[in-house]
Amino acid sequence: MVQKIIAAFLIFLSANSFAIVVTEEYLSTLASNWSSLEPAGAYDFIPEDLSYEAYMNPDFLAKLDEAGKKLNNTLEGKDIALPGFMVPIEFKGTDVSKFLLVPEAGQCIHVPPPPLNQTLLVDTSGEPTKLRDLYRPIIVYGRISVGSQSFDIADSGYTITDAVIETLSFSDEANINNIEDNND
């Protein structure tokens, strides 16, 4: 019974979300990406040949944690387009008024959450967006502001306002091309 309810809910979400088809050409038009949220040089201390022992060193982990707290102040007030995944934090039914945008599916559901400079608050309280499948990628367009905020599940280093949210859908053609490229 529970599985039928979950299946019906996922079908409802899929039918009620808007999608754009992602092709290689579309991906190349995205000027903004997750690394732009990191200030220049924040992670320069990481060697290219990082070993497991070095990675597990407490001093290295402390530096990594500090680097994740550094924000890119040059982004203040700029328009941004960023793909990622929705983690709802304020919602009523299927209307989401605030959510965290994270780079990978399932982040914030487990510990530790992504770094501060990789977590964005998306505020759609003026016009709530519909809840999407948490494992389905979205793209958020909007204006970014720099500044941290704390929530029960994670902290955010940035806020996106005036947001437009679209669900991403990869075309069969793009998937076939990727499979062929990987088999060469």
Predicted features and spans:
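N-terminal signal peptide c-region/cleavage motif recognized by signal peptidases
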Residues: 14-16
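Sec-dependent signal peptide recognition
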Residues: 2-8
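OB-fold and OB-like single-stranded nucleic-acid-recognition modules
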Residues: 19-184
